[in-house]
Amino acid sequence: MGKEKFERKKPHVNIGTIGHIDHGKTTLTAAITKVANLKSGGKFISYDEIDKAPEEKERGITIATSHVEYETDKRHYAHVDCPGHADYIKNMITGAAQMDGGILVVAATDGPMPQTREHILLARQVGVPQLVVFLNKCDLVDDEELLELVELEVRELLSSYDFPGDDVPVIRGSALKALESDDPNSAEAKCILDLLDACDSFIPEPVRDIDKPFLMPIEDVFSISGRGTVVTGRVERGVIKVGEEVEIVGIKPTVKTTCTGVEMFRKLLDQGEAGDNIGALLRGTKRDDVERGQVLAAPKSITPHKKFKAEVYVLSKEEGGRHTPFFTGYRPQFYFRTTDITGVISLPEGVEMVMPGDNSQFIVELIAPIAMEAGLRFAIREGGRTVGSGVVTEINE
């Protein structure tokens, strides 16, 4: 059996379930795969298969995640579900599972709970564009007014974190009843189809990497006598065409140059695009003007910064992290894309220290500027080992 060819007829969207423990995230994930696949003839994955999520390593951090996929008439979805609360935090901060949108699961029997709030905040911090809400276990609540009240509470909570609480679709239903039904057109399964419709219409289609402005982290620099300087790396986004102007950004003052050649596997190309490992020949650039850790980027598309706010997960001792807490003034290395840069941490007012296993927000000031924008991921390292993982939430200067 050869590998099935992935047919790219529909837009691809990455999505995931978030919400408080035992509110039904995994049951909903199973119900969606069942109903969607009964409708489109795909493969159903049971609750138990999803629940025994395999552990994956992302930047040295172990995260248990389940991946399922399903289709609607309009889209192909890749869906992540995590068994434990800590897995969600790690997943969202490391970007192990990039989310173009999320399904917030709230049990109508409980209403919003502490983790509901924490997941909404994290979604906001790491830049998940939109959420839709599934109000679960509605079959266990007889009182229509109570459902109205829970829905209102969820909408207000979303608004308080800058999601459009008044406009977010809220679908009511029972994931368990939908999962028990074998007919996708049954009354029990209708809530799942409504939820998928809401995802199709409310979660924006992601901009493909190739359609974004060009950026390539520089991994290596060579000089080729008579031709100039070649920088190599993997194109992160966009397209670079021979003859185009690019900027070298980060560490040193930004300089402009022209790309006079692109090669891949020793063959000359007209262009390099997102995902390609290329060498780019730069006109008039000296070998010493460029170094690993800088980026090659479309002019004016990204700027270098030193000071930023971050949301960070600090590895526990068991994960190979620190054994002791750290305080304001802690100076580890921050690994951005291809290089380590030293930086100093300032904890927010009222936060005395950060313990291994915590997630926290704080300000970082690097000793040299790095090409950055909100949403950029980084690792925190100490003597070459990873002790934390973070995402830039706001740029200060």
From Swiss-Prot:
Residues 174-176 are annotated as: G5. Residues 10-207 form the tr-type G domain. It catalyses: GTP + H2O = GDP + phosphate + H(+). Pfam families: GTP_EFTU, GTP_EFTU_D2, GTP_EFTU_D3. One of its GO terms (cellular component) is cytosol. GTP binds at residues 19-26, 81-85, 136-139. Its EC number is 3.6.5.3. Mg(2+) binds at T26. It is found in: Cytoplasm. Residues 19-26 are annotated as: G1. GO terms for molecular function: GTP binding; GTPase activity; translation elongation factor activity. Residues 60-64 are annotated as: G2. Its main location: cytoplasm. InterPro entries: EF-Tu_GTP-bd (IPR041709), EF-Tu_GTPase (IPR050055), EFTu-like_2 (IPR004161), EFTU_2 (IPR033720), G_TR_CS (IPR031157), P-loop_NTPase (IPR027417), Small_GTP-bd (IPR005225), T_Tr_GTP-bd_dom (IPR000795). Keywords: Cytoplasm, Elongation factor, GTP-binding, Hydrolase, Magnesium, Metal-binding, Nucleotide-binding, Protein biosynthesis. Monomer. NCBIfam families: EF-Tu (TIGR00485), PRK00049.1 (NF000766), PRK12735.1 (NF009372), PRK12736.1 (NF009373), small_GTP (TIGR00231). GTP hydrolase that promotes the GTP-dependent binding of aminoacyl-tRNA to the A-site of ribosomes during protein biosynthesis. HAMAP family: EF_Tu_B. This is Elongation factor Tu.
